[in-house]
Amino acid sequence: MPVKIPDHLPAAGILESENIFVMSETRAANQDIRPMKVLILNLMPNKIETETQLLRLLGNTPLQVDVDLLRIHDKESKHTSIDHMNTFYRDFEDVRHKNYDGLIITGAPLGQIDFEEVTYWDHIREIIDWSQQHVTSVLFLCWAAHAGLYHLYGLNRKILQQKRSGVFVHRRTCQHFPLLRGFDDEFFAPHSRFAEMDIEELKQHPELQVLAESDEAGAYLVLSRNNRNLFVMGHPEYQKSTLNDEYHRDLAQGLNPNVPQNYYRNDDPQADAIARWHSHGSLLVSNWLNYYVYQLTPYDLSDMTAMTPWESQ
């Protein structure tokens, strides 16, 4: 949250140059406050686990957040009871007439399947298109990030020979962006995917900005220049055990997976896993919710034209 300071205080310029969020008394006096309304499109098989992971991050912010859970209507969930889905999830027809402050679209275990071959691809496209007029900011995670970049900007992914799984070091490629406030120069984030985006294509695209990358895992944080779409190529929401669970699931299916890199102590899958990314994940979601949702969204959600983007940097 911002520090409110007197108008024209000399420290303001210094703090802003250090990427510290300050707000003048004049601006603070004109702020209206209400709960943030966030919609989560949950595409992961274990709905309850993913709900918990995302709500854990959203709940660690100082803002009050009202959450709606969204499903693909005609897609059966094999790992979550129909009672749970009918009780807690909405269909798109229930929300298409609404506006939201934020939308989170999760990853999906669709690996090497072409986007056009995904059985519910038309539903994904429809929801993404809808979000560009009805949501202040959209957070795309892992598979959803690739899908969003493909649908919105025509950028396709490259299929990897081996699944990229592990916890990798990342660095900021830009300094003075609200999303990166409080980030260390280097930080860890988990990845679990069968594909990657061409980082040079991302950097050369006039409507996109690469904010963080990894020598081992490639592009990590990509932001659209209108600040509406944030593409996160990894899984900052994962809990400590998730990569381990996925590794043993793949072993049981005879897929001969590589051991997740930089995850187990001494890279020994019989040893304990080390969670190095939780503080980063918490800060990332907090910054997104504060700077790209709360600070930009209109008080009256019926008026999405009232949104005032950050100046492109």
From Swiss-Prot:
SUPFAM superfamilies: Class I glutamine amidotransferase-like. Pathway: Amino-acid biosynthesis; L-methionine biosynthesis via de novo pathway; O-succinyl-L-homoserine from L-homoserine: step 1/1. Pfam families: HTS (PF04204). It comes from the Bacteria. The record marks G111 as: Important for acyl-CoA specificity. The keyword Acyltransferase applies. This is Homoserine O-succinyltransferase. It comes from Shewanella sp. (strain MR-4).
